[in-house]
Amino acid sequence: AKKTPGPEYLEPKAISGDHGLMLEERGAYGVIASITPSTNPVATVINNSITMLSAGNTVVFGFHPNAKNCCIKMVSILNDAIISVGGPGNLINTIENPSMEASTELMRHEDVKLVCVTGGPGVVKVAFSCGKKVIAAGPGNPPVVIDETADLDKAAKDVVNGASFDNNIMCIAEKECIILNPVFDKVREKMKQHGAFELKGEEITKVMKVVFDSNGQLIRKWCGKDAKVILKEIGIHVSDEIKLIIAEVDRNHPFVEEEMLMPILPLVRASNIDEAIDIAIVAEHGYFHTAMMHSHSIENLHKMASRINTTIFVKNGPSFSGLGFNGEGHTTLTIAGPTGEGCTTPKSFTRERRCVLIDYFRIV
């Protein structure tokens, strides 16, 4: 909440000239329908509520059914907080029994002027079919590249911390790690020193059978589970210090191609920086969401930043630094790459309004 921007982002703009004064201000849309996923639900409610209300709107949430109870509780806490400082009640609302059908009805309601949606292709498609302004935060599969010029110990620690944060449930977290071959083994060993457990040989296959069904689909019940819980399922018992599972795989492995949303990080070898960036671009799937790179080469950092073309690009830090944690800038949990708003602020949830007065109000 402390890192989420408020009304201070809504600065008016005035221009005076020979023909008078022009004033531009940011105006509220009114009622916003905010459709949220089961991943990172409570923090998203807090973040979206602050930014949307700061812009002068009210919001009605359509939660994922799996996150119903915690989100409804948070809405109640936020409304009580608003009332306690003299604000009106029920600025934040929710569907009592959330479902895809109920969320669709909400988005299409005539009083809803703006739709903000975070989710898969299905719900995003429905949002665009409503004929309203849509702010869409799509999926991500963020790659991280480590080259031979990086501070290898720091890079390994940052990647482990970023990929294991909230058990990899966040869309910005490192989902695959591409390492240049000359430093691959060193980075892998340093990751193990910082809390990673390496799968080898048949162990990789065993974990795949746990987290994927027979049709190759991700089994959602494993999303967000602790690394030790997943390892226990294949008969490996580790201490609480283990927070991430790593495994060396090829670039086409399901661990690389899928947004796993669990603390499993595939490691992929690359022979040079251009190959590493090529692998990262393919793995990112053109979502233009988030990417990271650890390097002391300005040329390599520039090359990847320009080619990967993501909304967030973190240099020499963990993924969560891109949201202002141990990094600069504001925090957002609605990263609207598909519709171009990027890291949303209160300004994202406003309309630009202009007022012009002819021939008056200029004082010089």
PLM feature segments, named:
Residues 1-22, 193:
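N-terminal Rossmann-like NAD(P)+-binding subdomain of aldehyde/semialdehyde dehydrogenases
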Residues 12-154:
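Rossmann-like NAD(P) dinucleotide-binding subdomain of oxidoreductase/dehydrogenase enzymes
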Residues 46, 124-251:
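ALDH superfamily catalytic-core signature
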Residues 60-65, 178, 316-317:
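Short internal beta-strands
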Residues 107-110, 151, 212-220, 259, ...:
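Short, surface-exposed amphipathic charged segments that create phosphate/polyanion-binding patches used
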Residues 109, 137-139, 170-173, 258-263, ...:
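Short glycine-enriched loop/turn motifs at secondary-structure junctions
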Residues 236-364:
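Conserved C-terminal structural/oligomerization subdomain of aldehyde/semialdehyde dehydrogenase
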